[in-house]
């Protein structure tokens, strides 16, 4: 559970960021947003809209945790936190005035590794010779 003072501080910071950078995009990373994206059935490479995420939140909130486990093949440690996670993502998007959340299908560590490999190959075109 997140302290309300910390949430308010974060929301204030997000508001300030959105004033400096008016066209911010939200990028979600981690198990909860990945599962929410899969449940949404949005095509890969497309952002999850906040409208769709709100629909998912409403649907998941109406379902008991035990049914979420079965219906969406959620792990026990995910089934009870996915609703608050969706709420948090929606709040973040709201405070930066974003209508979409980009959900990469590659993890952060994998993405960094991929980026480093691309950079190395660009700098060393004959590495395999």
Label the model's feature ranges:
Residues 1-129:
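Helical "lid/coupling" subdomains associated with nucleotide-phosphate turnover
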């Amino acid at each position: 559970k997140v302290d309300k003072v910390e949430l308010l501080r974060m929301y204030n910071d997000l508001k300030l960021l959105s004033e400096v950078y008016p066209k911010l995009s939200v990028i979600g990373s981690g198990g909860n947003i990945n599962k929410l994206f899969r449940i949404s059935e949005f095509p890969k490479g497309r952002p999850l809209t906040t409208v769709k995420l709100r629909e998912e939140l409403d649907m998941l909130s109406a379902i008991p945790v035990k049914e979420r486990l079965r219906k969406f093949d959620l792990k026990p440690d995910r089934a009870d936190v996915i609703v608050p996670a969706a709420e948090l993502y929606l709040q973040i998007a709201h405070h930066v005035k974003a209508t979409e959340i980009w959900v990469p299908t590659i993890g952060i560590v994998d993405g960094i590794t991929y980026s480093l490999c691309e950079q190395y190959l660009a700098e060393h075109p004959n590495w395999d010779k």
